Each structure stands twice: as structure tokens, then as C-alpha cells.
Amino acid sequence: MKKATFLVGIAAIALTLTSCCPKCKKADNNQQTATEQTTDSATEKATEQAANNAGYIDFELPGADGKMLRLSDIVSKNKMTMVDFWASWCGPCRAEMPHVVKAYNDFHSKGLEIVGVSLDERKDDWLNAVKELNMNWPQMSDLKGWNSKAAQLYHIQGIPASVLINQNGEIVGKDLRGEDLHNRLAELLK
């Protein structure tokens, strides 16, 4: 009994240490107005769809150059698309990024595209991290932090988080990291 309790405690600590969440940020950076907390019926329907795994939810956000990027345009052109939710201030995101870069380098020629969705609030922090971490794939951010439209649509509660979407629009993987990500991509992109 003590061993089971100990293992559950260790697992909880490990989960806490390996992801960033809204509560991890300073309270003043995480406040929302009543307007921001209100969602329209289309957003509610989309979030319900994501929760039921009925397929991916399309969204459009500004890219690094300020031009709007639509997820469906990227999904339709690739065998597999990984939507990677991250932020420059997130230590676990930075620790995971070499694995994501390796996956991109190993599988991009086989049909993988990655779309980075940053939960940063400052454009300079976001773009400096993209360069520093060698993230050579499309990047998006509305610079709204945890209030990001995409994060809300996909119920992102902690980062790093990811969603794998095949060309048919089906979600075929979630929150895969390191070797698990590499193995799943190898399986899907034979």
C-alpha cells in the first residue's frame, strides 16, 4: 500500500515538473476580463467537437510574418501535421524541442509538417525562441497567452502539448514526446 501511494506521488510530481500550465505564470499575466472568458456558440461547438475526438478543428492565426495562416491549408498539403503548443518561457517545452526538431528533420521529407502555436504574449520572446531553438516550420501566435483561440479550441491546459492530424483530418495522436513521438511518426509515415 505504501509503495502504491509513493508511486502515485512520484507520478504527480513528475507530471507537474514536465509541463507548464496557466497557474505556473504570474497571476498578473494570467488575468482575464469577463469578455475574454465569454465564448460564442461556434467556439463552444468547436471545443465540444475536439473533446469528442471527432477530428481536428480548423483555426487561423497570425504567422511569424504577421500574415494569417490557416491550419486546414497545412493539413491538406501534408500526410501528417503536428500542431505543437509551446511557449518561450516554458522550460519543459524548451527541453522537448530537440526531440521535435529531430522528428521534423527525420520525417519532413516523408510528409510531416509541424505547426508551432506559441502561447507567448510578447512577439520578440516568441520569435527569438523560434530562431534559438531551430524551429524551421510554420509558426503561429495571436500573442494572447493562455487566452489563445487555438489553445481554447483544443482545451490546452498545459504545455508542451501536441496533436497529430492525418491528411483526412483525423486526430491520430496527442501529447507524444521524445521516443514515443518518433515511434508513432515512423508507424504512420511508413
Regions found by a protein language model. Give the residues of each.
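C-terminal motif of bacterial Sec signal peptides marking the signal peptidase cleavage site
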Residues: L17-S19
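Short, internal strand/loop/helix patches
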Residues: L127-N168
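Thiol-/selenol-based redox modules, centered on thioredoxin-like
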Residues: L164-K190
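N-terminal "domain-start" segment that seeds a small globular fold
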Residues: T33-S76
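Short active-site neighborhood of thiol/selenol oxidoreductases, capturing the structured segment around
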Residues: L71-G91, V100
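Structural microenvironment flanking redox-active thiols in thiol-disulfide oxidoreductases
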Residues: A95-L133, G145-A151
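Bacterial lipoprotein signal-peptidase II cleavage site
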Residues: C21-N29
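Bacterial N-terminal signal peptides that target proteins for export
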Residues: M1-V8
